[in-house]
A protein has these predicted regions:
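Positively charged, solvent-exposed patches that mediate nucleic-acid binding
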Residues: 1-107
Length: 107
């Protein structure tokens, strides 16, 4: 799974991507210029808590993305953790991710 790293790539997804919000995850999706392998970023803002909490949230998001067979080719996807992500089960996060991907038109 390739990741989005540069600020320019994040900016492009924010400016021209679709977004969907859930209670456990927020998602931003933008179509890439080429049909290469999709890239994913996992974001846990500092307002969620200390490093232990943020890292757990990112691990749960990463595993949910793996279970849902992300990445989908031709897309850049940014997954944001919310305060409820820390206490949620992997199954709940995975279900929410699937619902949000359908909402933005990927699945």
């Amino acid at each position: 799974m390739k990741t989005i790293k540069s600020p320019r790539e994040f900016e492009r997804v924010f400016s021209c991507g679709k977004r969907a919000y859930g209670s456990l995850i927020c998602i931003r999706v933008a179509k890439t210029c080429e049909d290469g392998e999709a890239r994913v970023a996992f974001v846990a803002p500092k307002r969620l808590g200390n490093a232990v909490v943020r890292n757990r949230c990112k691990r749960v998001l990463r595993e949910a993305a793996r279970i849902e067979s992300l990445p989908v080719e031709g897309y850049d996807i940014i997954l944001f953790a919310t305060p409820q992500t820390h206490n949620a089960s992997l199954q709940d996060v995975s279900r929410e991710l699937q619902r949000l991907l359908g909402k933005v038109g990927i699945l």
